[in-house]
């Protein structure tokens, strides 16, 4: 396909046009008084949302060159989303401000490479300052504040996420589901839950709710198929003498063995339930080993030289309670704390070593199941459109609170970056010179952009607000919801340091790339050929 090649100023201006379009579409959502954006969908109802990265992903322009500019800024948003899960709009606004200021300098004859060096050095300095400013959070109140701000000032959501974190711990998993009611609810599962239910409904002890509840059961864990009932007889006899229930978790149970278990259960000889092991292949084995650690038992596997027919009672795990329905199994166990901690450390090491996002996700799930538990937030709303918007806000809020726990919090509402401008100026004047200093000045001039946009979206004059904030103490900022200047930390208007840091780093990275662009090679727009004229028909006197 033929290409169009554009050089120098013309190339950078074309990129700038695309960047302007995307930045403006995303920036309208910033702050407590930010508006929504409607996305038209090819199929189904339009989506009304307030989430920067989702809007950025939807924007495609007709002009290929301008579209390249859109793609660059979109990258700043999605990288921030990947790293911190929130702050995508801030990253877009920052990147846009840096590109605008930088292009003016390049047009005036500044060396783009030196400017980029200055931008990178300024960015590194600011990252270290954000780390210094960050206050670690421990209490549930600060977590709730973080969630509230990220969810667009929804206090109920903030409190719900704080409760969930309280219950499942920092390592715990908080997942989102679309609820069936109008209200958003929180459901917390203690212990380990996995997505496999009983093999036969005859194992249910509560026929009304179709649940099997086993109190203080023994747990037999094996990674092989149980084909013959003879394999199970020795261990079943030992358990029958104790009078305790038994849960069998195996790769599969063949019909004959299953029938024997069901008959014993129905006759009241032995309270037993059987479940298929979760996962596949190596992952299944790893999850079974996790369960063995959690229940203080052993995984009966031929790799370790253990066979079912010579399994002893002390090889079996124990739990306080096991609840099984047709889809899930929940084990509430009080395992050996030291062993569980050791296993968690092992999983964390594996997470550090793997490059695959999918593997990381699965390891995080395993870690959560071992360490804390699982909290499920069931999102409720009146319409599907509202549900989707709410779900995206909740996702941001969950990510923001996790980021806050990791790296601490800083004053929110664009305040931190605005105050850091004067620190950057002092540092740059004594450490940089020439065009590198100009590069640092570009970053310094852009730092107030998020605050200015928040103020403008609230109907105030952005430049005036930014100047007022700069003249106040470092934790003071502008509360766009009320129009007052207040102590942001005391008022609970906070941002996770990780979100602020990621947004700044990604914006600086993209700005540097755009400024050092000297040539663009893009596809030529395809000419639509006129449709050929229709044929003369079939001929003859036929009526078609």
From Swiss-Prot:
It holds the Pfam family Cpn60_TCP1. SUPFAM superfamilies: GroEL apical domain-like (SSF52029), GroEL equatorial domain-like (SSF48592). It is found in: Cytoplasm. GO terms for cellular component: cytoplasm. The keyword Coiled coil does not apply. The keyword Cell cycle does not apply. It is an enzyme of class 5 (isomerase). GO terms for molecular function: ATP binding; ATP-dependent protein folding chaperone; isomerase activity; unfolded protein binding. GO terms for biological process: protein refolding. It catalyses: ATP + H2O + a folded polypeptide = ADP + phosphate + an unfolded polypeptide. Its EC number is 5.6.1.7. InterPro entries: Chaperonin_Cpn60_CS (IPR018370), Cpn60/GroEL (IPR001844), Cpn60/GroEL/TCP-1 (IPR002423), GroEL-like_apical_dom_sf (IPR027409), GROEL-like_equatorial_sf (IPR027413), TCP-1-like_intermed_sf (IPR027410). Its main location: cytoplasm. Forms a cylinder of 14 subunits composed of two heptameric rings stacked back-to-back. Interacts with the co-chaperonin GroES. NCBIfam families: GroEL (TIGR02348), PRK00013.1 (NF000592), PRK12849.1 (NF009487), PRK12850.1 (NF009488), PRK12851.1 (NF009489). This is Chaperonin GroEL 2. It comes from Prochlorococcus marinus (strain MIT 9313). The lineage of its organism: Bacteria, Bacillati, Cyanobacteriota, Cyanophyceae, Synechococcales.
